[in-house]
Amino acid sequence: MAIILGADAHGNELKEVLKGFLQQEGFDVTDVTDIDKDFIDNTLAVAQAVNDKDTNLGIMVDAYGAGPFMVATKLKGMIAAEVSDERSAYMTRGHNNARMMTMGAEIVGQELAKNIAKGFVTGHYDGGRHQIRVDMLNKMA
């Protein structure tokens, strides 16, 4: 499993914090950020790298998280969540099988962002009754 990271200029500093933290936690991290591009291009780069392998997960950081969320959810096979708390990060993996999350650097601080990222990457899909919802989401895009 690789954790694919991306950011625009507004999220790059927090993305660097997350990269160091996740590497320290022992995760394989790939940074696809092109700082000269906006959130749309960087979100697409993260989502495409996540979709390259079923076990990959993605985290995209910009100022508020909303823009990258909208971009990611337009892509076939991508279930993404905009997250600003630890519990939602963990639960979106467990119940929604989200493979990508977005967050805003102007919304969350560094310590909260680390906890959110850890909750997301350590969460596991529960399957079972949640699969109906995941199937419905996958039919939509």
Swiss-Prot record:
UniProt entry tagged with the keyword Nucleus: no
GO annotation terms (biological process): D-allose catabolic process; galactose catabolic process; lactose catabolic process via tagatose-6-phosphate; pentose-phosphate shunt, non-oxidative branch
Protein name: Galactose-6-phosphate isomerase subunit LacA
Uppermost EC category: isomerase
Pathway(s) this gene product operates in, as recorded in its UniProt entry: Carbohydrate metabolism; D-galactose 6-phosphate degradation; D-tagatose 6-phosphate from D-galactose 6-phosphate: step 1/1
Keywords: Isomerase, Lactose metabolism
Domain of life according to the entry: Bacteria
Oligomer and partners: Heteromultimeric protein consisting of LacA and LacB.
SUPFAM superfamilies: Ribose/Galactose isomerase RpiB/AlsB
Record's keyword annotation contains Zinc: no
InterPro entries: LacA (IPR004783), RpiB_LacA_LacB (IPR003500), RpiB_LacA_LacB_sf (IPR036569)
Reactions listed under catalytic activity: aldehydo-D-galactose 6-phosphate = keto-D-tagatose 6-phosphate
Pfam family, one: LacAB_rpiB
